[in-house]
Amino acid sequence: MADLWDDIYNDTKLLEELAPIAIDAALLQGVLMRTKESPNSSDVVSFAPFALLPSPVPKALFEQAKCVQEDFNTLVDRISQDTSFLEQVLSSTIKVDDFIRRLFAIHKQVQQEDCTQEVFLGINRSDYMFDCRDDGTPALKQIEINTIAASFGGLASRTPAVHQHVLKFLRKSEESSSILTNDAVEGIGWGIAHAWALYGSVDATVMFLVENEQRNILDQRFIEAELCKRNVRVIRRRLADVFERGTLDEERHLFIDGYEVAVAYFRTGYVPQDYTEQDWEARLMLERSRAVKCPDVPTQLVGTKKVQQELSRPQILEKFLPDKPEAVARIRETFTGLYSLDIGEEGDEAVRVALANPDQFVLKPQREGGGNNLYGEELKEKLQECKDSEERTSYILMDKINPKPLKNCLLRAGGRVQISECISELGMFGVYVRHRDQMIYYDQVGHLLRTKAIEHSDGGVAAGVAVLDNPYLV
């Protein structure tokens, strides 16, 4: 596995020749991002960073991640319907984390107002690394599950063609034909279209809720194109636009700029800096509305690290999946050690062990978007700072996953062509649609492989650390 492409990596002249061919293939396939200098204009775009060659991934672990995704779909949906569980689990976090507190307050307010919802749409992505066990064999271990704005389904659907072209250029036709197709964008588009259809108005629109700066717009445009094929109109608006021009009628139908909104698909709203006070008002309006929210607030809260940690406790999975013992076993097999930092003996012991062995753990806040986790000395400093205060309850502790590094060449605009020691993270996309109490559809719909140099502890493609990749199953 380690020497899959060594004949290429050892040929510096070939690498220099190959890199521009791969970059042009990415341009031809639309694997693109806007530039940092002009994040809201497509006049000038660049290729999204990607790996020169596909990274080897154990076939058994890929299939394991694929198989368990439907289980995670069911689990996320069921937890999102249990407000008392979310309130109990997040009670300590809400005291010290204003972002989580405000989200939960919106959920409680909408519940008290009895703003019933009939159609539910979930688009999530469960991320894993391949932990190297003591005997040298790899094991699939979950990093997190993203329940809001799970990105790169669009671009990931186009990267297989890039690596197929590169391998054909290298006269490796058999290897080229082994690159997996990736139907993430079709599955995501199908899920949104199905929710739109269940809303029941052919004149209604799908609204993408987007950030003020939209570098990754091309990833979203692929999903828009899928919806266009199905004759579903898409509009793009910011939360600020919803506040300024959004209205609810007496039956809670949401309108903006003359459009009735059937589905509100979030590609923003996952970190505190996404919100002004007016944006929070817009989020409340959206949550009150009859529009299908992807996600609604409780589903977003299911994706918090605190809920992830709580699910690792005995009997919690069984509480939500009492009819699915095999699913419980599949999910539990992906868990690594997760530890509460709540005030009390259990949290005190976790702090003590982490301070004594900081390189064995990751300190994780309740934040999405990459680049937020703390490792090593930074972990130690933060825990020393907050070990005796309630601030520590805004974090969880997780065993550090240790993948075996592999070689690759990471291509970035303006970057050098050089070989790096890398690790990869595998994401599986899941989509589900529920109508009242009936699950209409739930499936694993595609994958995402991101690879980064080992010197980077945290951060994804959008954060400028990882690059897009494809799994080459071995």
Swiss-Prot record:
SUPFAM superfamilies: Glutathione synthetase ATP-binding domain-like (SSF56059), PreATP-grasp domain (SSF52440)
EC number, UniProt record: 6.3.2.3
Subunit structure: Homodimer.
The name this protein goes by in its record: Glutathione synthetase
Residues the entry annotates as binding Mg(2+): E144, N146, E368
Keywords: ATP-binding, Glutathione biosynthesis, Ligase, Magnesium, Metal-binding, Nucleotide-binding
Function: Catalyzes the production of glutathione from gamma-glutamylcysteine and glycine in an ATP-dependent manner. Glutathione (gamma-glutamylcysteinylglycine, GSH) is the most abundant intracellular thiol in living aerobic cells and is required for numerous processes including the protection of cells against oxidative damage, amino acid transport, the detoxification of foreign compounds, the maintenance of protein sulfhydryl groups in a reduced state and acts as a cofactor for a number of enzymes. Participates in ophthalmate biosynthesis in hepatocytes.
Tissue expression: Expressed ubiquitously.
Alphabetized CDD domains for the sequence: eu-GS
Cofactors (names): Mg(2+)
Superkingdom per UniProt: Eukaryota
Example of a GO MF term: glutathione binding
Binding site for substrate: 125, 148-151, 214-216, 220, 267-270, 450, 461-462
Pathway: Sulfur metabolism; glutathione biosynthesis; glutathione from L-cysteine and L-glutamate: step 2/2
Cofactor annotation remark: Binds 1 Mg(2+) ion per subunit.
Pfam family, one: GSH_synthase
Cellular component, GO annotation: cytosol
Similarity comment text for this entry: Belongs to the eukaryotic GSH synthase family.
Top-level class of the enzyme under EC nomenclature: ligase
Organism annotation: Xenopus laevis (African clawed frog)
Sequence positions that bind ATP: 144, 305, 364-373, 375, 398-401, 425, 452, 458
Reaction equation(s) it catalyzes: gamma-L-glutamyl-L-cysteine + glycine + ATP = glutathione + ADP + phosphate + H(+); gamma-L-glutamyl-(2S)-2-aminobutanoate + glycine + ATP = ophthalmate + ADP + phosphate + H(+)
